[in-house]
């Protein structure tokens, strides 16, 4: 059995290679970076919602950094949405850092609740494959803008946060069990 594999075009004129399915090297995989050691979420829950928020920020950043590193090994040259620089830029902002971060389909959202049902604050930021970032307002739902950098996107979301007293972080029902 013969398979044709089409790796990303390297520019040297070779855009396909043929691999024999019986070749012993077909089962060899490229070495991947070790999985990160994530924070102990159960211990964080026992200390309260603020610790859950901090542990989840750390967990998200480590997890997405690892996924990005794996992507670079498995799919060299293919674009990867800018979720890692987005998480770094958002984590650098104290007003966002105190909210529970969550991701869905690469989009970053911020909740004042540490569990479902989420209480999403402000809006969301979606890293695009072209390297830009799309910012959406939550209510009423609307695209606020598309910007070049993660820092610009974070600045737009900060403008969407309510003024006045900071949102109170609440634990999910599961955290009280």
What are these regions (language model features)?
Residues 4-7, 20-23, 27-115, 174-177:
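Negatively charged, low-complexity tracts enriched in Asp/Glu with abundant Ser/Thr
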Residues 11-31, 136-174:
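Ampiphathic alpha-helical segments that act as solvent-exposed interaction surfaces
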Residues 74, 125-127, 152, 161:
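General N-terminal targeting signals
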Residues 3, 7, 115-141:
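Short aromatic-glycine-(Arg/Gly/Cys) micro-motifs in beta-strand/loop hairpins
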Residues 124-127, 171, 175:
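Membrane-targeting and insertion segments and their boundary/processing signals
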Residues 90, 123, 147:
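Aromatic/pi-system hotspot detector in well-structured domains
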Residues 1-15:
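N-terminal amphipathic/basic-hydrophobic helices that include classical n-h-c signal peptides
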Residues 3, 21, 99, 129-132, ...:
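Structured catalytic/translocation cores of nucleotide/phosphate-coupled proteins
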């Amino acid at each position: 059995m013969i398979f044709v594999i089409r790796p990303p075009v390297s520019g040297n004129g070779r855009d396909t290679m043929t691999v024999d399915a019986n070749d012993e090297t077909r089962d060899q995989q490229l070495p991947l970076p070790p999985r990160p050691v994530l924070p102990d979420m159960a211990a964080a829950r026992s200390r309260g919602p603020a610790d859950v928020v901090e542990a989840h920020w750390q967990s998200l950043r480590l997890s997405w950094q690892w996924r990005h590193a794996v992507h670079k090994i498995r799919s060299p040259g293919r674009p990867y949405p800018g979720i890692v620089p987005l998480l770094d830029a958002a984590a650098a902002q104290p007003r966002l850092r105190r909210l529970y971060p969550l991701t869905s389909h690469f989009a970053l959202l911020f909740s004042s609740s540490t569990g479902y049902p989420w209480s999403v604050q402000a809006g969301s930021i979606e890293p695009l494959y072209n390297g830009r970032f799309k910012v959406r307002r939550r209510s009423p739902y609307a695209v606020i803008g598309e910007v070049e950098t993660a820092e610009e996107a974070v600045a737009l979301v900060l403008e969407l946060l309510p003024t006045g007293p900071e949102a109170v972080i609440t634990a999910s029902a599961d955290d009280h069990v």
